[in-house]
């Protein structure tokens, strides 16, 4: 059982690290030029299909975290750390569904709106700043997983 616990936690850490890599890449390479020139740059959204990455990474993260939680449930120290990560992740997913994704959809459709480029710029910059905050929370949520790895289970 110890091996399964450790392997599941290692898998969750790898998946989480992959998500963090996607966050950094998106925020350093993709979003700055895309959000700086809306609505003119809205056509860039058709050139990148990052949804396949995110629609794979997030279910893998959810499954790996739940499996890790189940396998480590009897180990209180690990369980609590894994639950911290899950709680932060749940808040991030909810805010993503309620704010970030709808705004991205609005950005994609910005060429057909009556909103001025100046207003799109402000919305894009606000979105990006808030998304950096969301990303920081995702990094913070990684720390408990790493600490759980360090917990003695033998």
Each language-model region and where it sits:
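Interfacial segments of alpha-helical transmembrane regions
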Residues: 2-17, 67-92
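Short, charged juxtamembrane terminal tails flanking transmembrane helices
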Residues: 2-3, 150-154
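Interfacial loop at the N-terminal end of multi-pass membrane proteins
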Residues: 4-65, 104-125
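Structural signal for membrane-spanning alpha-helices in multi-pass inner-membrane proteins
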Residues: 23, 65-72, 96, 142-149
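Membrane-interfacial segments
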Residues: 38, 76, 111, 153-154
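Hydrophobic alpha-helical transmembrane segments of integral membrane proteins
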Residues: 87-108
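Histidine-centered, metal-coordinating catalytic motifs and their short helical/loop contexts
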Residues: 124-133
């Amino acid at each position: 059982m110890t091996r399964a616990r450790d392997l599941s936690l290692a898998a969750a850490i790898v998946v989480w690290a992959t998500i963090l890599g996607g966050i950094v890449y998106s925020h350093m390479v993709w979003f700055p030029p895309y959000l700086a020139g809306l609505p003119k740059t809205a056509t860039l959204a058709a050139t990148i299909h990052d949804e396949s990455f995110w629609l794979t990474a997030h279910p893998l993260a959810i499954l790996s975290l739940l499996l890790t939680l189940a396998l480590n449930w009897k180990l209180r120290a690990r369980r609590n750390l894994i639950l911290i990560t899950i709680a932060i992740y749940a808040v991030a997913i909810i805010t993503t569904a309620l704010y970030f994704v709808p705004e991205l959809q609005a950005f994609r459709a910005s060429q057909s709106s009556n909103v001025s480029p100046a207003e799109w710029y402000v919305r894009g910059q606000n979105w990006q700043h808030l998304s950096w905050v969301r990303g920081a929370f995702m990094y913070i949520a990684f720390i408990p997983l790493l600490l759980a790895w360090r917990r003695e289970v033998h």
